[in-house]
Structure formats: structure tokens, C-alpha cells
Design a protein with these regions (language model features):
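An acidic-aromatic
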Residues: 29, 99-156, 298
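Gly/Pro-enriched, hydrophobic low-complexity segments
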Residues: 170-294
Length: 308
């Protein structure tokens, strides 16, 4: 009975991870612009001191980025997909500009069940229960490629930072691409960036400049809409900076999937609660998959996910 429960739980968990990691895959066949659009760079009309204050605030938010090269932590990982919910333990291991890895344990037992690994060049998902793995290129997903969404955008979400789609980092010169509007020092200040069908909104504490939430909105007449929000809480000191020890990802979508595929749940929620956060550097950045493991396609995995 316990073994059956663990298998079901793990299947659900891997399925939700894949759906979260490949949210856009359901729309990858949609007719999107094949050219790489550039961010909206038209500056707003200057308004003297207010414009200067807004620009200074964007710079303050940008400067809040932590200096650490490595961030590691034990985590409590929870996910709700449709009416199904599960919580497990695991590890989060991140090395700046190299990798983001989430390792998850089998419920009740504690052994590693699988891992989700993002690098600059690929996404790797290892299923240790069934000795299978998926390895995909970001360029294989048209939605991600056409909208400049890559490893560095995902890294910025996990590291609580601003990002510019299609860029590897945000330079001081790029800060003019962001639009901030300080409305009330007692309320979070929105910082926005628009790119084709995408709109990004960072909500930052008007006094500290710490990013409390990110909203990503995608709207397309041909393939539906998707809203993703990432909320940050429990900020704790990391050197001279602060880093959120709690990350909650929410997704709502009306994305159209390939014919014959079950509809994607309209709502999905993923939570990562960090414990024992450290800057340990003594670990290998990249996973080597055993030759005994079978490589399966993204399409095969998506079919399994949507059939749950």
C-alpha cells in the first residue's frame, strides 16, 4: 500500500513539475511570430523630479541582488494541480549563471525520487523511480524562444531579481527599459516591462526596494492566455543583502493544447519553503545520467501528464 501511494504521489509530482517547467509547451505549435521581438524601449514622457525618483527606485531594486555565487537549502516543496495536492521534502541547489536544481524525495521514505535541473543550454528531468529522463533544449519550445525566455529569466525569478527577456544579465544601461511609478510609499511600487504578447510586472517594497511579487502575463488570440505570479516572503540576511526563503508560484491558463490532449488545469500552485540556507560550493553543477536510464521525449511526458 505504501509503495502504491509513493508511486502515485511521485507520478503526480513529476507531472506537475513538468507542467510547471514546460507551461508553454502546450502552445508551442501555435502560430507565433517567428522573429525575435525587442522589448518596448519607448521612454515615458519626462516628468522632472518624479521621473528621476522612479529611475532611482528601479536602480535601487536592481542593486538589491545578492552577491552570492551559490545558494543551497533543504526545502519543503508543495504543489497543487487542479484538485490534487502533495508536499514533499527535497533540496534546492543554485549556482549563478550555471544551474538551478530541485531534488525531490519520495514521500514517507526520504530517498531521492527525481530532480529537475535547469542549465544555460537545456532542461533535464530525471525520474529515479522509473529510470527515465527528459532532456530538452530551450529552442525546442517556440514560445520560449520567440519571447526571449531562457535560463536567465528563470534564474532571475529564483534569485529575486529583475530581468530583460533575451538577455543574460541586466546592466545599468538596460534599466531605462523598465517603467516604475511610485504611487504611495505605503504600497508596493510596480515596475513594468512589455515585450510583444508578454507583460512583466515586479511589485517592490517602496521603502526597501525588495521585490515582493512578479506577475507575468501572456495574451494571444490564437493560443489563449497565461498568468504566472511569483510571490516572495520570509526575507533573511545573506551577507549584506536579503534573500527570500519562501517562493510561491501561481499559474492560471487558458492555453490551447494539441488536439486529443486533455485540458491543462486552469490553476496550479507551487511552493518552496527553504530551510538551512547556505552558500555551499562543494557540489557538482551538472547531473550525469546513468547509461541505464531511458531517454523519453517531451511529447511523451506531456501526454502522461495530461492523462493523469
Amino acid at each position: 500500500m505504501k509503495r502504491s501511494y509513493n508511486k502515485i504521489a511521485f507520478n503526480l509530482l513529476v507531472g506537475c513539475l513538468m507542467a510547471a517547467a514546460l507551461t508553454a509547451c502546450g502552445t508551442k505549435k501555435a502560430a507565433l511570430n517567428t522573429q525575435h521581438p525587442t522589448p518596448n524601449t519607448q521612454p515615458s514622457t519626462p516628468n522632472t523630479q518624479q521621473t528621476t525618483a522612479n529611475s532611482q527606485f528601479v536602480k535601487k531594486v536592481h542593486d538589491n541582488a545578492v552577491y552570492a555565487k551559490n545558494i543551497t537549502a533543504k526545502i519543503d516543496f508543495s504543489i497543487m494541480r487542479g484538485d490534487k495536492e502533495i508536499s514533499v521534502g527535497g533540496k534546492l541547489m543554485m549556482r549563478r549563471d550555471e544551474v538551478i536544481r530541485i531534488q525531490l524525495n519520495v514521500p514517507l521514505i526520504g530517498m531521492e525520487a527525481g530532480r529537475l535541473e535547469f542549465t544555460k543550454d537545456y532542461v533535464l528531468i530525471v525520474d529515479r523511480i522509473h529510470s527515465e529522463y527528459v532532456k530538452g533544449d530551450y529552442n525546442q519550445v517556440d514560445f520560449l524562444k520567440n519571447n526571449g525566455l531562457n535560463f536567465y529569466a528563470l534564474q532571475a525569478l529564483f534569485w529575486n531579481q529583475l530581468f530583460v527577456p533575451g538577455q543574460t544579465k541586466v546592466t545599468d544601461a538596460m534599466l531605462k527599459l523598465f517603467t516604475a511609478e511610485i504611487l504611495n510609499t505605503q504600497q508596493p511600487t510596480p515596475i513594468t516591462l512589455e515585450k510583444d504578447n508578454m507583460k512583466y510586472t515586479w511589485l517592490a517594497n517602496s521603502q526597501s526596494g525588495l521585490i515582493q511579487r512578479v506577475d507575468v502575463d501572456y495574451n494571444s488570440k490564437s493560443s489563449g492566455s497565461t498568468h504566472v505570479s511569483c510571490e516572495y516572503a520570509d526575507f533573511k540576511a545573506m551577507g549584506v543583502k536579503s534573500f527570500p526563503n519562501s517562493i510561491t508560484l501561481n499559474m492560471q491558463t487558458t492555453a490551447q493544447l494539441p488536439a486529443g490532449t486533455k485540458k491543462m488545469p486552469k490553476n496550479m500552485k507551487l511552493g518552496i519553503r527553504m530551510k538551512s540556507v547556505d552558500n555551499d560550493s562543494k557540489w557538482d553543477a551538472f547531473t550525469t545520467v546513468s547509461k541505464k536510464y531511458k531517454q523519453v521525449s517531451v511529447d511523451d511526458v506531456l501526454k502522461k501528464i495530461m492523462s493523469m
